Design a protein with these regions (language model features):
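Non-catalytic extracellular/periplasmic "stalk"
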Residues: 1-68
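Catalytic cores of peptidoglycan-degrading enzymes
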Residues: 58-186
């Protein structure tokens, strides 16, 4: 013999009408919470994307600078010439060249004196160039993530040895990458 049970709605303290109203209120509350969670998720995603699009870092994880931006003796002629980027090496041909920010590949192929080159548009006026590669691993139109391998260190084009020539353009004008290598502030 069973004992207990739900009884009728009057014993529970709610009429069927009140119970229906309470269920509707809870459904609205649940919908509001779902909307709030979706908005919070979008905010977090936007912040992560903004962080990934932020141009900062160097294209070789364990590389060092062998030639800075600005005037320098041309390695082929010895005459003073403008160097439009920073050259990094790690002494190991074939090492990974990585993007310093997420973006869209706008060039992937040979480019006269630059040799095999990848260019990435990061939005907000920023484009980066990675040159003298041995191999390219991305195609034009491809979306790349921050830190993604896009090429390997080589010595193609006008080059004296394995390295990556790294340039940054802001609104179409080349800028010194040095101020972006250790950049942390937005």
């Amino acid at each position: 013999i069973g004992v207990g049970g739900l009884g009728d709605s009057q014993q529970a303290g709610y009429s069927l009408f009140e119970l229906g109203m309470e269920i509707e209120r809870l459904e609205r509350t649940l919908e509001d919470r779902e909307t709030q969670l979706e908005i919070l998720g979008e905010i977090v995603l936007d912040r992560e994307m903004e962080s990934d699009l932020f141009v900062a870092g160097k294209p070789l994880k364990d590389g060092w600078i062998v030639s800075n931006f600005g005037q320098r003796p041309d390695p082929f002629t010895g005459k003073l010439a403008f160097h439009s980027g920073i050259d990094f090496t790690n002494g190991r041909p074939g090492s990974d060249i990585n993007t310093v920010a997420a973006g869209v590949v706008v060039w992937s192929g040979p480019k006269s004196k630059y040799g095999l080159t990848v260019e990435v548009d990061h939005g907000k006026g920023f484009t980066t160039r990675y040159s003298h590669a041995e191999k390219l691993f991305v195609d034009v139109g491809e979306v790349v993530k921050k830190g993604q391998r896009i090429a390997s260190v080589g010595s193609t084009g006008r080059s004296t040895g394995p390295h990556v020539h790294f340039e940054i353009y802001k609104n179409g004008r080349v800028v010194d990458p040095a101020s972006y290598i250790n950049r942390t502030d937005r």
